[in-house]
A protein has these predicted regions:
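Residues on the lipid-exposed face of transmembrane beta-strands in outer-membrane beta-barrel proteins
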Residues: 19-23, 125-131, 141, 194-200, ...
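Outer-membrane beta-barrel proteins
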Residues: 1-24, 41-45, 97-128, 179-193, ...
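Membrane-embedded beta-strand positions of outer-membrane beta-barrel proteins
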Residues: 1, 21, 32-34, 141-143, ...
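Structural signature of Gram-negative outer-membrane beta-barrels, strongest in the C-terminal barrel
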Residues: 212-216, 239-336
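Transmembrane beta-strands of outer-membrane beta-barrel pores
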Residues: 2-4, 25-27, 36-40, 145-149, ...
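Flexible, surface-exposed loop regions and adjacent strand-edge segments
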Residues: 12-16, 47-57, 61-62, 155-166, ...
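Repeated loop/turn-to-beta-strand initiation elements of outer-membrane beta-barrel proteins
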Residues: 27-32, 136-139, 204-207, 268-271, ...
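Transmembrane beta-barrel wall of Gram-negative outer-membrane proteins
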Residues: 1-3, 8-44, 53-55, 59-85, ...
Length: 336
């Protein structure tokens, strides 16, 4: 699918696909599914901006979206373009028709900034099986793997160098505070796991046991792809090499196993019990996209991430139940 977008610079396209195979006989069924999707969408997440960091259009009578539409800003997108601002009068100029003036963001070579885009791709693979070797036993199992990758890329007009951990100077060694940037922030992820359970039923027993093993790995990253040189800097000091200004990895392991059983004492009385064990581990390390100030070069340092936590849970439960002619009562004890 595709769209031209209503706001300036918000054209986009997306798509998805699906495929699957199934094989079965009287006792065994095997399935495989592949599901994927992608999107590249122009963004306008700043909303309807009524001004800039220096002044507000509200000072010039713009208070509603209808006001903005009437003055030529109905499709204005601050991620795509800027408002002309007169620093002397602290006002936004208007043309003879009363429309506010806008300008497109430009690179140093004169080319126009195309648009801010969000880009993402994801693919899911799922294989499952059900096996019924007898009237008493049923086995279910599934494995899965999902890969995802995405990023957004945006123009950052008149941003501070310190926002990206940079200390910039000109030819006289004077500090330069601001410039135009293009930043790219994104992630990649791998998720995979296994699920299995077995069920046994006869005249007296109903038993179920299962296993769940899940693992997630993710990476967050950020790059500075462009810095305008129009501000005249000749040197930049920063705490990282190249144009990657942060990078962090994270993982989650989630493992659990359970067993439950119900025994029919009589036609009206049952006893039941179950127990679950769960283990969860979180880990993340690397560099955050926030910076702290230093008294000497490189003048800034990335915030460090260092989390490594594990948790274990054991949850038992037991009880007795009574049921007759549509009525049911039970008593149970559990530990959570």
């Amino acid at each position: 699918t595709g769209t031209n977008g209503f706001r300036h610079g918000t054209a986009g396209r997306s798509g998805s696909y699906y495929g699957g195979l199934t094989w079965f006989n009287n006792k065994l069924q095997i399935k495989y599914k592949n599901i994927g999707n992608f999107e590249k969408t122009g963004q306008a997440w700043n909303g309807i901006v009524a001004g800039n960091s220096d002044a507000s259009l509200m000072d010039q009578g713009i208070k509603t979206y209808q006001d903005m539409w009437n003055h030529g800003l109905g499709r204005f997108n601050s991620l795509y373009e800027g408002l002309v601002f007169d620093k002397a009068s602290k006002k936004f100029p208007q043309d003879a028709s009363g429309n506010f003036q806008t300008f497109r963001y430009r690179m140093d070579d004169g080319s126009l900034w195309n648009r801010t885009t969000d880009n993402f791709y994801q693919n899911h693979n799922i294989a499952s099986m059900q096996w019924r070797p007898s009237n008493h036993w049923t086995h279910n199992a599934a494995i899965h793997y999902t890969y995802g990758y995405g990023y957004y890329k945006e123009f950052r007009p008149n941003n501070k160098f310190e926002k990206f951990g940079m200390y910039a100077t000109d030819a006289t060694n004077s500090k330069i505070k601001r410039s135009d940037f293009i930043r790219r922030k994104g992630l990649s992820q791998h998720t995979y796991g296994l699920l299995y359970n077995a069920n046994y039923i006869n005249e007296k027993w109903d038993m179920l046991a299962g296993l769940n093993l899940q693992h997630f790995n993710g990476n967050h990253f950020g790059y500075i792809d462009y810095i305008s040189k129009r501000v005249g800097f000749v040197n930049i000091v920063k705490p990282y090499d190249g144009n990657q200004y942060y990078d962090s990895d994270a993982s989650k392991r989630d493992y659990s196993a359970f067993g439950k059983a119900l025994y029919h004492i009589t036609q009206q009385w049952d006893v039941f019990g179950d127990v679950q064990y769960r283990f969860v581990a979180y880990k993340t390390d690397g560099l955050n996209d926030k910076f702290i100030s230093l008294s000497s070069a490189p003048y800034y340092a990335n915030q460090q991430l260092n989390i490594n936590e594990t948790y274990s849970f054991l949850n038992p439960k037991a009880g007795i139940s009574f049921h007759k002619e549509g009525h049911k009562a039970y008593f149970s004890v559990a530990l959570a």
